[in-house]
Every structure is written in C-alpha cells, then in structure tokens.
C-alpha cells in the first residue's frame, strides 16, 4: 500500500466511496481513504472535499443516513463559464424561465437584472436553480428570449 497518492487518485476514490452510500460519518470516510493508501488524509480534508463536491447526507436503501454525491450534475465552481451554468431557456406568453445548474440561478439573475430594460427585462426572481424573468413587454417576449439565448450561447 502506498503512503501517498496523487490528487486525481484521491478525487476518483473519494467519489467512488461516496457512490457506495454506506458511510455515515466523516471519520468513516477518513478510515476508508486511509485503507486505500491515503495515509495523510484527515477529517478536515474530508470535510472540505464533501463541500467542494456538493455531497449531502441522505437515507440509503437500508434507511441509514449516509453521505452521497447529488444526482444532479453541473454544480457550479469558481471557474465555470456562465454559459455552462444555463441548462434550459423556455417561455410562455407572459414569462421566460431559465433553468441553471444548482446554486447558479441568483448569479445569472443578477447578470440579467444588470442588463435590464434596454434588453427587454423588467425584472427577475431567482431560486436555487430556476429564474423567472418578467419581460418589459409581452408583445416583445420573442426578442427578449432571443437576447437571453444569445447572451448564454444557448441553442436548443
């Protein structure tokens, strides 16, 4: 067993361990990583990795609380280009809806609010991964939709 392994191996094995959905505490994850040869791993490092990869605690098939990676892909990072955070753009006769990666909606909404009325956006409401956009004019909603799509290089 090696005493140290590189960062890529650590990330790969960390994700594989979480996919097993059987570790209920950070100390159990530390022990599993140490058993895989990462002797310098500690609880603090595991805690940072859990945050970095968006791990959550949930119930597994045995109804035990365990750490796992969320099913959703595309958790935004500091280096994510904004266009990669927009997953879908759709509309009806009165409103435009933008779906984003989890956690990115408020960032994208702030950008849309900053371009505002000149581009046909009266205002936005953002949750975690969804933005409701109220156009300045319902008659011009198609133009506003195209502006938003072109801003994020979104093609259906």
UniProtKB/Swiss-Prot annotation:
Principal localisation: cytoplasm
Any one GO cellular component localisation term in the record: cytoplasm
Keywords: Amino-acid biosynthesis, Arginine biosynthesis, Cytoplasm, DNA-binding, Repressor, Transcription, Transcription regulation
Domain of life: Bacteria
Subcellular location: Cytoplasm
Record pathway: Amino-acid biosynthesis; L-arginine biosynthesis [regulation]
GO molecular function, a single term: DNA-binding transcription factor activity
Biological-process GO terms, alphabetical: L-arginine biosynthetic process; protein complex oligomerization; regulation of arginine biosynthetic process
Biological role stated in the UniProt entry: Regulates arginine biosynthesis genes.
Family the entry assigns: Belongs to the ArgR family.
Stated name of the protein: Arginine repressor
Species, as recorded: Shewanella sp. (strain ANA-3)
């Amino acid at each position: 067993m090696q005493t140290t392994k590189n960062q890529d191996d650590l990330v790969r094995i960390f994700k594989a361990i979480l996919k097993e959905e059987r570790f209920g505490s950070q100390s159990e994850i530390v022990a599993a990583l140490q058993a895989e040869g990462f002797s310098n791993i500690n609880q603090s490092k595991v805690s940072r990795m859990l945050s970095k990869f968006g791990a959550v605690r949930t119930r597994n098939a045995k109804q035990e609380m365990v750490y796992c990676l969320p099913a959703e892909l595309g958790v935004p990072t500091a280096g994510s280009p904004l266009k990669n955070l927009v997953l879908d753009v759709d509309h009806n006769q009165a409103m435009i809806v933008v779906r984003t990666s989890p956690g990115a909606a408020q960032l994208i909404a702030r950008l849309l609010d900053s371009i505002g009325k000149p581009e046909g956006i009266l205002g936005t409401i953002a949750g975690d991964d969804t933005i409701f956009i109220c156009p300045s004019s319902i008659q011009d909603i198609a133009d506003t939709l195209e502006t938003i799509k072109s801003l994020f290089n979104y093609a259906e």
